[in-house]
């Protein structure tokens, strides 16, 4: 065990040493000494030395304004380097990869050992695999794209240094490159100067495809194919690619006025342009590789006399010319020029697939399978995974925007006010219009700007090439009319196909009503005819947790999914559950494998569709090797969940969960909504107000510019509590409820639930993870430095509650310390704490100075403001999840 970590620790200390040399070269010995002193004090304070803890506080409080930024940057950059080393460790032969026998192989062996499963059943489950990852631009990806690129390069250096056969002069070269990269990072500003636009966010998404997924996906499929051949004697069909990517960047307009119909149109074009760019590179390689002469009569007929001497190359060159023509046309469109479509414009995947597949079949038939299964196979699989659109886009809009648009239309037509009608009247009107042959929209009508925007967006969907838009998600969906309204607006825009429209249920009440809403919809004949046996429903994790606390929210999510699965099964509808999980626990994040196996039985039959958010995209898909490992984890979890579904919970367990849910929700809301001191405490004990200044995402932090906690988006709400280490949204209410049930004499029942029910054990595991990252003395320090004395009792009460909660969870899980079953994560948190602690203390100090300046009516000191931004980014890196 320790041998594994020693490789990680030595990489971390080596990177730290190089960073130290860089700081010394840039700023002189005295700053490096200052940083080193703070690091040593922090280490000793972590080990329990109280005197050194006090000295640490004094040292950081006494830093001059000139020293603030260098010290903050030193610890922040160190944490980025530690994260890079850790990411490398997860794929290095000396690290996790060594102790982690191939995850898919392990799952296949486990499945083969089940007496009631045969190879044919397993093969069928593999063939129905479907994984759709939806990349979202959450404002939580704090690290700039330029630094992410440098971190990737550092990773390559670590890989080269791991090679035992490396010659001395090569080692010196790699070390020199490492020093250059770390120096470049040090001399780069880590905080963006302005907010990214939605187009910038989309480009960030394309960069992930280019730098990692493009290579990672074919590698993952090779890995999967090898394991299936070895364990089942089964080869993946060439056209079988179970994974696809969709993006919300440029399509998600919920609460983001910056995402307009024009932006979506632009991003769709940009995405196609990027696809032609990447496929051109592939085809360029194939033109040079496929110089073979021998071909089947079919292929020779396809190329004619002109291409007979080098048939494969001839076809590739023709495809290259089409790609280039398509790219030029897209470039002109992006510049706003209106050009006629050229001959051979690529708009559908088949146009790419056919010439490539013809070459593949011919090579196979002529005994050149080894060549066919090289670069050509990788490109074919990319066509299936990415294709002409590169990534498909989801459109997301809030339900009230559709209601308001229809209200405006009905008022203009003089048939009443749609907004004030009852649900029954709305449904009757919508179904009548959906069945009508005449258009609803009047010809020369001038809608308001908001309504025009909604109608324009529907037009973009209707005009986009088929297959480039994946789904229309309705946030804050509450009623059947919310879904029918979108279908009507799409019909009016002239859409020629049935677009999947997914209601998103995200508050506690909406989750509890989800089954009822879907049952009503499925009872409408017109609707049943439209959806052709398929329905997608999105489950919101972050808003329900913010509304009711994690325990009540996770039980409501479980029950909603369970009820929807059963309703759709009965109705003969294939249900795809779309999970809107976040990276952090308060937004539903959990290690993928555990999270999937803790869902209700049958929840993955329709495949898995899940959001991958902000900073999690980098941790899970930042490098091709990490991509392979993340996709393999998902694959094995889906196979296992479908073939060895978790048990149906006993009725007594359901009753206990109902009880836990009620108590925890009351406790949570008792503080967050009903305690008059809570909002002022939250505003002063966390950097919530200052977070608004960080130029993170393109989306405003609040749904409405004024208002309390309820109007805050779920992400800043969680981000703020992560910064002061109280981690409140991820645990408040849960432990109190567990304690109450234990006092009622049900501890042994809770222990059984923990042992035998993945849903419950995952909940406790997630609480342990949060408790490991929370820190009482730091949360206390924020209070002392920033909070009015009258509010101190509330802070103390919350910290006492946290301490109690930790004891309760450990007792139920029968563990002596947190994270006993995941030592690797515990180790990683401990490793980072030494560097995160000084940033937290410094942040409290900076918040104090910044607020004092504001109170005195002076203008802010740019050194303080800049250092504050760096500590926020640094703590986020230390916690490995922002919001």
Curated annotation (Swiss-Prot):
Keywords: Carbon dioxide fixation, Lyase, Magnesium
Cofactor: Mg(2+)
A biological-process GO annotation: oxaloacetate metabolic process
Keyword Lyase assigned: yes
Active site (record annotation): 138, 546
EC numbers: 4.1.1.31
Molecular function terms, GO-annotated: magnesium ion binding; phosphoenolpyruvate carboxylase activity
Catalytic activity: oxaloacetate + phosphate = phosphoenolpyruvate + hydrogencarbonate
InterPro entries for the chain: PEP_COase, PEP_COase_bac/pln-type, PEP_COase_Lys_AS, PEPCASE_His_AS, Pyrv/PenolPyrv_kinase-like_dom
PANTHER family: PHOSPHOENOLPYRUVATE CARBOXYLASE (PTHR30523:SF6)
HAMAP family, per database record: PEPcase_type1 (MF_00595)
Biological function: Forms oxaloacetate, a four-carbon dicarboxylic acid source for the tricarboxylic acid cycle.
Family: Belongs to the PEPCase type 1 family.
UniProt protein name: Phosphoenolpyruvate carboxylase
Gene responsible for this protein: ppc
């Amino acid at each position: 065990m320790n041998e594994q970590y020693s490789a990680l620790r030595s990489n971390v200390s080596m990177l730290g040493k190089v960073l130290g040399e860089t700081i010394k070269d840039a700023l002189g010995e005295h700053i490096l000494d200052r940083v080193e002193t703070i690091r040593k004090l922090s280490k000793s304070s972590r080990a329990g030395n109280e005197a050194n803890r006090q000295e640490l506080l004094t040292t950081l409080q006494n830093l001059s304004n000139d020293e603030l930024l260098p010290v903050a940057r030193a610890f922040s950059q160190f944490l980025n380097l530690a994260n890079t080393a850790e990411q490398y460790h997860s794929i290095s032969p000396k690290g996790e990869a060594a102790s982690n026998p191939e995850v898919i192989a392990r799952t296949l062996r486990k499945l083969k050992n089940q007496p009631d499963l045969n190879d044919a059943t397993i093969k069928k489950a593999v063939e129905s695999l479907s994984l759709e990852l939806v990349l979202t631009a959450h404002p939580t990806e704090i690290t700039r794209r330029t630094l992410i690129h440098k971190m990737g390069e550092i990773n390559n250096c670590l890989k080269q240094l791991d090679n035992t056969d490396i010659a001395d002069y090569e080692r010196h070269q790699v070390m020199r490159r490492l020093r250059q990269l770390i120096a470049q990072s040090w001399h780069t500003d880590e905080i963006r100067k302005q907010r990214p636009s939605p187009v910038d966010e989309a480009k960030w998404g394309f960069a992930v495809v280019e730098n990692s997924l493009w290579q990672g996906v074919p590698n993952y499929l090779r890995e999967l194919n090898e394991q299936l051949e070895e364990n089942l004697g089964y080869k993946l069909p060439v056209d079988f690619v179970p994974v696809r990517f969709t993006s919300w960047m440029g399509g998600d307009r919920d609460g983001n006025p910056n995402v307009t119909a024009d932006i979506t149109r632009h991003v769709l074009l940009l995405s196609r342009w990027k696809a032609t760019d990447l496929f051109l590179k592939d085809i360029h390689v194939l033109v040079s590789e496929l110089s073979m002469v021998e071909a089947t009569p079919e292929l020779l007929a396809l190329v004619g006399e002109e291409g007979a001497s080098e048939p494969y190359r001839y076809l590739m060159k023709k495809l290259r010319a089409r790609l280039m023509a398509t790219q030029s046309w897209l470039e002109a469109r992006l510049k706003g020029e209106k050009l006629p479509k050229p001959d051979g414009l690529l708009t559908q995947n088949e146009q790419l697939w056919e010439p490539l597949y013809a070459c593949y079949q011919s090579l196979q038939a002529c005994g050149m399978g080894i060549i066919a299964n090289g670069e050509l196979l990788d490109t074919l699989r990319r066509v299936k995974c990415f294709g002409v659109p590169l990534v498909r886009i989801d459109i997301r809009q809030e339900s009230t925007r559709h209601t308001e648009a229809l209200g405006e239309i009905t008022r203009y037509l003089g048939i009443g006010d749609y907004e004030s009608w009852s649900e029954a009247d709305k449904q009757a009107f919508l179904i009548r219009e959906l069945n009508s042959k005449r258009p609803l929209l009047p010809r020369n009508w001038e809608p308001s700007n908001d309504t025009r925007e909604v109608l324009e967006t529907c037009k973009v969907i209707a005009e986009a090439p088929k297959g480039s838009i994946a789904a229309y998600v309705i946030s804050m969906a509450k009623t059947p009319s919310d879904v029918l309204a979108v279908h009507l607006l799409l019909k009016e825009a002239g859409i020629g196909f049935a677009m999947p429209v997914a209601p998103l249920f995200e508050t506690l009440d909406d989750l509890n009503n989800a089954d009822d809403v879907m049952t009503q919809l499925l009872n409408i004949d017109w609707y049943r005819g439209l959806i052709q046996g398929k329905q997608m429903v999105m489950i919101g994790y972050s808003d329900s947790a913010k509304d009711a606390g994690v325990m009540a929210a996770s039980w409501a999510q479980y029950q909603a999914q369970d009820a929807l699965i059963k309703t759709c099964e009965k109705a003969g509808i294939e249900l795809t559950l779309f999970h809107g999980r976040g990276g952090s626990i308060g937004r539903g994040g959990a290690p993928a494998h555990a999270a999937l196996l803790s869902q209700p039985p049958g929840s993955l039959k329709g495949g898995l569709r899940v959001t991958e958010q902000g900073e999690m995209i980098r941790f899970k898909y930042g490098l091709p090797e990490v991509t392979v490992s993340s996709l393999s984890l998902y694959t094995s979890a889906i196979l296992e969940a479908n073939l060895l579904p978790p048990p149906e919970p006993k009725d007594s367990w359901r009753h206990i969960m109902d009880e836990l849910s009620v108590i925890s929700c009351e406790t949570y809301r008792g503080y967050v909504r009903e305690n008059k001191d809570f909002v002022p405490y939250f505003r002063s004990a966390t950097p919530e107000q200052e977070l608004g200044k960080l130029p993170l995402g393109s989306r405003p932090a609040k749904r409405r510019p004024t208002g309390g906690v309820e109007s805050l988006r779920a992400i800043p709400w969680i981000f703020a509590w992560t910064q002061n280490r109280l981690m409140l949204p991820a645990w408040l209410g849960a432990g109190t409820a567990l304690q109450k049930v234990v006092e009622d004499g049900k501890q042994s029942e809770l222990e059984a639930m923990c042992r035998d029910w993945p849903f419950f054990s995952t909940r406790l595991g997630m609480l342990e993870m949060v408790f490991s990252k929370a820190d009482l003395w730091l949360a206390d320090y924020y209070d002392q430095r920033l909070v009015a004395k009258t509010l101190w009792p509330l802070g103390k009460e919350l910290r006492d509650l946290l301490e109690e909660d930790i004891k309760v969870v450990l007792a139920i899980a029968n563990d002596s310390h947190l994270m006993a079953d995941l030592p690797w994560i515990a180790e990683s948190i401990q490793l980072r704490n030494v560097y995160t602690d000084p940033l937290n203390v410094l942040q409290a100090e900076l918040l104090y100075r910044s607020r004092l300046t504001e109170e005195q009516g002076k203008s802010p000191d740019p050194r303080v403001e800049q250092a504050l931004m760096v500590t926020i980014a640094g703590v986020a890196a230390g916690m490995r999840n922002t919001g």
